[in-house]
């Protein structure tokens, strides 16, 4: 899996101060998507053990208290990304149990397959649904369009 961008300190993509990883690869091709450069699975750089350890280290860093990890993209729940992200979120929950995990996906919760659903026990907040430009509303919190739903599983 590739990722396009990593922000070790982010206050935009979820509650509190967070680490945010924008993964590469999305097949939804939403009209008006703000991150079209993330659609290609080959965009960005390889998410390797070094990057994974960096995120764990940042989450544990007591100099800047982070509430959790955000996964966006691209689409973190695309099956090609789940292969890499499932063991990663398992590790985050194991090594940083006090941190929450937020995930943005174009898939709807009721559309997820078995592989994608395997991620759910490790996700605290899931924002689902494709971005629909005709339903775009800049006043929405954590969502780009009115069809998207915020699912709070744990918090």
Swiss-Prot record:
Binds 1 [4Fe-4S] cluster. The cluster is coordinated with 3 cysteines and an exchangeable S-adenosyl-L-methionine. PROSITE patterns: RADICAL_ACTIVATING (PS01087). Its cofactor is [4Fe-4S] cluster. It comes from the Bacteria. GO terms for cellular component: cytoplasm. The keyword Protease does not apply. It is an enzyme of class 1 (oxidoreductase). Keywords: 4Fe-4S, Cytoplasm, Iron, Iron-sulfur, Metal-binding, Oxidoreductase, S-adenosyl-L-methionine. It catalyses: glycyl-[protein] + reduced [flavodoxin] + S-adenosyl-L-methionine = glycin-2-yl radical-[protein] + semiquinone [flavodoxin] + 5'-deoxyadenosine + L-methionine + H(+). Its main location: cytoplasm. PANTHER family: ANAEROBIC RIBONUCLEOSIDE-TRIPHOSPHATE REDUCTASE-ACTIVATING PROTEIN (PTHR30352:SF2), PYRUVATE FORMATE-LYASE-ACTIVATING ENZYME (PTHR30352). Forms a tetramer composed of two NrdD and two NrdG subunits. Activation of anaerobic ribonucleoside-triphosphate reductase under anaerobic conditions by generation of an organic free radical, using S-adenosylmethionine and reduced flavodoxin as cosubstrates to produce 5'-deoxy-adenosine. This is Anaerobic ribonucleoside-triphosphate reductase-activating protein.
């Amino acid at each position: 899996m590739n990722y396009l961008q990593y922000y070790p300190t982010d206050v935009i993509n979820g509650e509190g101060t967070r680490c945010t990883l924008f993964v590469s690869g999305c097949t939804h091709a939403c009209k008006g998507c703000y991150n079209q450069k993330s659609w290609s699975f080959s965009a960005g750089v390889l998410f390797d053990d070094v990057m994974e350890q960096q995120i764990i280290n940042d989450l544990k860093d007591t100099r800047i208290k982070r509430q959790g990890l955000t996964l966006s993209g691209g689409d973190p729940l695309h099956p090609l990304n789940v292969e890499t992200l499932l063991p990663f979120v398992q590790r985050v929950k194991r090594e940083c149990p006090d941190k929450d995990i937020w995930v943005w996906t174009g898939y709807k919760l009721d559309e997820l397959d078995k592989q994608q659903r395997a991620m759910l026990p490790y996700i605290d907040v899931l924002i689902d649904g494709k971005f629909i430009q005709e339903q775009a509303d800049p006043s929405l919190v954590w969502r780009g369009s009115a069809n998207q739903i915020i699912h709070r599983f744990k918090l």
